Amino acid sequence: MTFSVDKVRADFPVLSREVNGLPLAYLDSAASAQKPSQVIDAEAEFYRHGYAAVHRGIHTLSAQATEKMENVRKRASLFINARSAEELVFVRGTTEGINLVANSWGNSNVRAGDNIIISQMEHHANIVPWQMLCARVGAELRVIPLNPDGTLQLETLPTLFDEKTRLLAITHVSNVLGTENPLAEMITLAHQHGAKVLVDGAQAVMHHPVDVQALDCDFYVFSGHKLYGPTGIGILYVKEALLQEMPPWEGGGSMIATVSLSEGTTWTKAPWRFEAGTPNTGGIIGLGAALEYVSALGLNNIAEYEQNLMHYALSQLESVPDLTLYGPQNRLGVIAFNLGKHHAYDVGSFLDNYGIAVRTGHHCAMPLMAYYNVPAMCRASLAMYNTHEEVDRLVTGLQRIHRLLG
């Protein structure tokens, strides 16, 4: 199948609107991607004609809704090549998935004197839950440092592992720098030391195929809203043997086998014991439509188009005076930058006046900002619906801002 960015853009209604009298150039998909009509329509159709509570009724609507929900679990398992759909837990997003692991697996397996390894490039969602866990149990948090080019100092990694290392929690792709970490060698090293590995895949799954069996990671988590799906839904993958041993971290309906006031409560099997309460069924249906949409386009086709666009953007940005780029030359999805000594918020505001949407701030990565000694950065993210013309508009906008502000 030949990838056509024009055909893709036609599927996204918001891309036809104007901002400040100019065509919208949406360069903020790493924060949250826009939604194609196929996703919007699938969720709307479910609420119009198919809605019912799942797992709780024998009537037709409930049975059909349950089947649709479980079919999305199967589709998601194929999307990341899990061995079984029962290795996937529906969560609100990457943040909840990581917190689930920290509070369930972490509370059961990390003790005083143990250690957990993260990196200096992590999103706060892959830092704070581990800080909280370490504070609860008296464990140590160790950090893989950054290089100036935005890669990790991997030569330090073997020195961080010891017999007390319980987990390596690492991002697949940095949400600020676009760095893709060499997961295969990192996971192999962790397993050699008896540690488990959690991968934050929030910035990876939309850019190229992910195979959790080939990676051999123990946990993999991602959000739907960055993958052209709805907000409030994501996927946590856990190897089946681990998942079946993990205790629930939230109690309520759907996650129980029996409840007795005199004899206590027993849990249902995983993954359902981690899905207490009424799920975001509409979001799940929308996620299924997003997975179907992306799969039909072909992730390899998307990857090829996006990489060509990224190479073009990096080359064109060289023409902008006083522009500082952060991150390696080979990157996925994002370009973080600052213009001279101007604050990122000011630059982002000017770009918005030109109809260009970029993200500004610390990007939930304050330790990374501290490493580069800046309070904030601008971040332009490139998705499958972005164009060379939009890159040109970004470059022209930055050149214009430089002329105006000096």
Curated annotation (Swiss-Prot):
Q: Which HAMAP family match?
A: SufS_aminotrans_5
What is its biological role? Cysteine desulfurases mobilize the sulfur from L-cysteine to yield L-alanine, an essential step in sulfur metabolism for biosynthesis of a variety of sulfur-containing biomolecules. Component of the suf operon, which is activated and required under specific conditions such as oxidative stress and iron limitation. Acts as a potent selenocysteine lyase in vitro, that mobilizes selenium from L-selenocysteine. Selenocysteine lyase activity is however unsure in vivo.
- State the compartments where it is located: Cytoplasm
N6-(pyridoxal phosphate)lysine sites (modified residues)? K226
InterPro entries to which the protein is assigned, alphabetical: Aminotrans_V_dom (IPR000192), Aminotrans_V_PyrdxlP_BS (IPR020578), Cys_dSase_SufS (IPR010970), PyrdxlP-dep_Trfase (IPR015424), PyrdxlP-dep_Trfase_major (IPR015421), PyrdxlP-dep_Trfase_small (IPR015422)
Q: Which Pfam families does its entry note?
A: Aminotran_5 (PF00266)
Protein name (record): Cysteine desulfurase
Family listed: Belongs to the class-V pyridoxal-phosphate-dependent aminotransferase family. Csd subfamily.
Q: Name one GO molecular function term.
A: selenocysteine lyase activity
Q: Which residues form the active site?
A: C364
